[in-house]
Regions:
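Short, aromatic- and glycine-rich surface loops/edge beta-strands on solvent-exposed regions
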Residues: 1-5, 101-109
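Short S/T/G/P-enriched beta-strand
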Residues: 6-55, 71-73, 109-149
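Short beta-strand/loop motifs in extracellular/secreted proteins, especially
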Residues: 23, 44, 62-66, 102
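A short beta-turn/strand-edge loop motif at beta-sheet boundaries
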Residues: 52-64
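Short, acidic Ser/Thr/Gly-rich low-complexity loop/linker segments typical of extracellular
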Residues: 77-88
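Short, hydrophobic beta-strand segments
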Residues: 86, 90-97
Length: 149
């Protein structure tokens, strides 16, 4: 910073600005491509930020775990990731359950609990089995079964 006043010699002062305490999360890469039982095609990346949106890069708050949970379905894989320099990069996360719109919640706990949410569409996976719900019964040659499958 430089200070000036009229005919006086300018004075300068150097200082470093640092981030404040962790106050919010920002999803820099949203999870997408959720097929039932398979890992997301795009894994989420979450940034820990101070109240002004600056990434928290140093101290224990910059390396804390970021946890992802699901609103109603089973979530598995790397659901807890230690941040590195304020960035948590997830891998292997997947959902299993009823297809539909699911809310993912990302959470940190230091200095206080903070969350950020996103929605993701869970779509059906490839068929893996065929189930016969009603078995054919009372079948005779060239005569229709009395109970159809």
């Amino acid at each position: 910073m430089t200070y000036t006043s009229g005919a006086l010699t300018a004075a300068t002062q150097s200082f470093n600005l640092t981030h404040g305490p962790a106050a919010q999360l920002s999803i820099t890469t949203q999870a997408s491509g959720a097929t039932n039982g398979a890992v997301f095609t795009v894994q989420p990346v979450v940034e820990i930020q101070d109240q002004d949106g600056n990434r928290v890069t140093t101290g224990s708050q910059a390396t804390q775990n970021v946890v992802v949970s699901a609103s109603s379905e089973t979530i598995a894989g790397g659901t807890s990731q230690a941040a590195v320099g304020g960035v948590a990069t997830f891998s292997g996360v997947k959902l299993t359950g009823t297809v539909g719109t699911i809310t993912l919640t990302y959470t940190i706990t230091s200095p206080t609990s903070k969350t950020k949410t996103q929605t993701i569409a869970l779509v059906a996976g490839a068929p893996t089995q065929l189930i016969v719900k009603t078995a054919a019964a009372t079948c005779q040659s060239r005569i229709a079964c009395t109970t159809q499958p």
